[in-house]
Amino acid sequence: MENCKVIAITNQKGGVGKTTTAVNLGVGLASSGKRVLLVDADPQGSLTVSLGIKNPDELDVSLSSLMQSVIDDEPLAEGAIIRHQESVDLLPSNIELSGMETGLFNVMSREYVLKNTIDGMRKSYDYILIDCMPSLGMMTVNALVAADSVIIPSQPNFLSTKGLNLLLRSISKIKRQINPRLKIDGILLTMVDNRTNNAKAIISSLRSTVGENIRVFRSEIPFSVRAAECSLSGESIFCHDRNGKVAAAYEALTKEVTELEERAKNRSGPDRVR
């Protein structure tokens, strides 16, 4: 279990590139020889659709099914995990997870249901990436309790960066009260358009202020129409536009993430959650 790292990719704001990051970081890690499971923890099923499952609501078994088995203290159903052509596994989601989100409030140890669902899978993977829903609701709390670390995608604009403080406080609270091992791997700047002075100013400010206590990844994901097209084809940017700037950026991010893990194994660094 110790060899698997669970990363929650989260931001309570929608449209900041969480799902795109989950897909492309996951495929990037798989391309470097890592065993990767992607977990869709959003009832909208964006990650599931992005990996080519066009009708997720027709799936017989999904994340919600497995979580219900944990709640009922029953064995997990087989056949939930789907193998994608780009060598990543997917634990899909559908609209049933919306009911699970509401139902968790009446469950004992409700914050631990997702953790108990995926803990048995850790032995089969090097990385498990959880694509969180755009809220700070009970499913996101479950993801943060299940995770070892967090990656926070954020656009370089006023509204996105304004919401960071709330998210950071929530992560810190979960660390103090429930999951003491939780740490922040870093903030990932997405949909970056360096042609605008506003974006440049926000990035500079973010790196000089928040970056004093929390890593801001060196890699920046540029804005690209090609990246937005990937979900329609059910593939990663590495298949859709292998030689493009977004693929290069996600390849660089993959290296940063694996370097973080290598350094963590070699020495115990300071905890960066405040």
List each model region and its residues:
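P-loop NTP-binding core
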Residues: 1-274
